């Protein structure tokens, strides 16, 4: 049952798919965060965007440090678009909250492709009895949008994820309360999740970071491989986002950044290019703000990334020269940043690219995640 119409606006109807009941939600939240102030104008032209990413990908450079001139408090009332799913028999014992990465919206976790073959939500709910909550990150999709440099940054988005979690734990959305909540992230969503549990270590009972590592050396490959352009240059997005947003400018860019060679169906690439979303320069400038420091989180922690991940492995997670060959793969190097995690696991998925859920190897990734959560949460 719903508790408060003032706090929740329901979509017109629930969606019944297989053995689950799903409902689209629009959830108002009051947020405050300490954001960076960057000395850069909104990116309006293709030259603006290209120059930005050339500076971002510059070897030995740190564009965020170069541009930051201080910090300020950002506050406001926003709305978050989400989808809540439970098994037909009723809510599961554990709620999984999932946060997507750059270029996606919440459909990343439940894409309607090939009879939901690539849906992590379907596996988690239908086959394993979990409840799930997917959401469009603040600034993306059907959630509130905002100013693209100094408002929509990782700090405000972490505040949104924390508030969303509290609303479900405290029964202010549905009367059912969850005593155990786990957080899953992909890419930027993993960086958010990492920051969330470092800031609020008791907010989660376990985390899964997909498409993630603690190696920043390869972000320039993603920045330049994405062929980013102003959102006005992307017909499918131009009417949905304001000036200042950016998005991938070609299907080959999406292929480069998200798919491993021979590990994907071309129809999935087509779907992703047609349904891809925009992002803000403010997000890109702050994505590294939560990493590089030891995390205080003490719960079960899984880092799982594709072998051919471009931004976090440079296209080969087993090439370890960037860390002086200290571990057998780049994902295992994350362990030192989780000194309190119990347990910690690092897994590399063979052949998979950065878009872990969308490759032929997705089944192995899903099995690994669900086995970890069932064993430890």
Positions of the model-derived regions?
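Alpha/beta-hydrolase fold nucleophile elbow
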Residues: 173-187
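Short beta-strand/loop motif that positions the catalytic acidic residue
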Residues: 297, 303-305
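Fungal secretory targeting signals
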Residues: 1-19
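Catalytic active-site module of serine/aspartate enzymes centered on a nucleophile-bearing elbow/loop
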Residues: 339-377
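N-terminal cap/lid segment of alpha/beta-hydrolase-fold proteins
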Residues: 19-91
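Short, surface-exposed "cap/lid" segments of acyl-processing enzymes
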Residues: 89-133
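Alpha/beta-hydrolase active-site loop
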Residues: 150-175
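Alpha/beta-hydrolase-fold enzymes
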Residues: 194-279
């Amino acid at each position: 049952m719903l508790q408060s119409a003032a706090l929740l606006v329901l979509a017109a109807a629930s969606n019944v798919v297989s053995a689950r009941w799903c409902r689209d939600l629009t959830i108002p939240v009051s947020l405050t965060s300490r954001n960076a102030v960057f000395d850069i104008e909104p990116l309006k032209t293709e030259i603006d965007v290209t120059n930005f990413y050339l500076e971002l990908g510059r070897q030995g450079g740190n564009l965020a440090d170069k541009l930051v001139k201080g910090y300020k408090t950002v506050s406001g009332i926003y709305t978050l678009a989400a989808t809540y799913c439970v098994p037909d028999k009723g809510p599961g014992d554990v709620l999984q909250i999932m946060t997507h990465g750059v270029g996606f919206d919440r459909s990343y976790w439940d894409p309607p492709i090939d009879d939901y073959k690539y849906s992590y939500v379907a596996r988690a709910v239908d086959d394993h009895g979990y409840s799930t909550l997917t959401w469009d990150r603040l600034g993306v999709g059907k959630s509130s949008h905002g100013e693209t440099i100094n408002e929509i940054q990782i700090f405000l988005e972490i505040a949104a994820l924390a508030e969303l979690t509290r609303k479900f734990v405290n029964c202010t959305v549905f009367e059912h309360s969850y005593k155990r909540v786990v957080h899953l992230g992909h890419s930027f969503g993993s960086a958010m999740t990492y920051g969330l549990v470092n800031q609020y270590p008791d907010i989660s009972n376990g985390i899964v970071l997909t498409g993630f590592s603690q190696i920043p050396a390869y972000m320039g490959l993603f920045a330049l491989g994405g062929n980013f352009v102003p959102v006005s240059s992307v017909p499918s997005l131009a009417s949905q986002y304001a000036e200042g947003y950016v998005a991938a400018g070609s299907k080959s860019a999406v292929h480069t950044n998200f798919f491993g060679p021979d590990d994907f169906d071309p129809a999935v690439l087509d779907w992703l290019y047609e349904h891809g979303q925009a992002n803000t320069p403010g997000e890109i400038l702050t994505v590294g703000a939560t990493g590089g420091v030891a995390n205080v989180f003490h719960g079960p922690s899984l880092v799982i990334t594709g072998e051919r991940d471009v931004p976090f492995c440079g296209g080969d997670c087993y090439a370890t020269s960037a860390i002086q060959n200290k571990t057998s793969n780049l994902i295992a190097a994350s362990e030192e940043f989780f000194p309190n995690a119990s347990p910690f696991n690092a897994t590399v998925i063979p052949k998979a690219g950065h878009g872990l859920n969308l490759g032929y190897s997705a089944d192995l990734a899903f099995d690994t995640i669900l086995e970890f959560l069932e064993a430890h949460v």
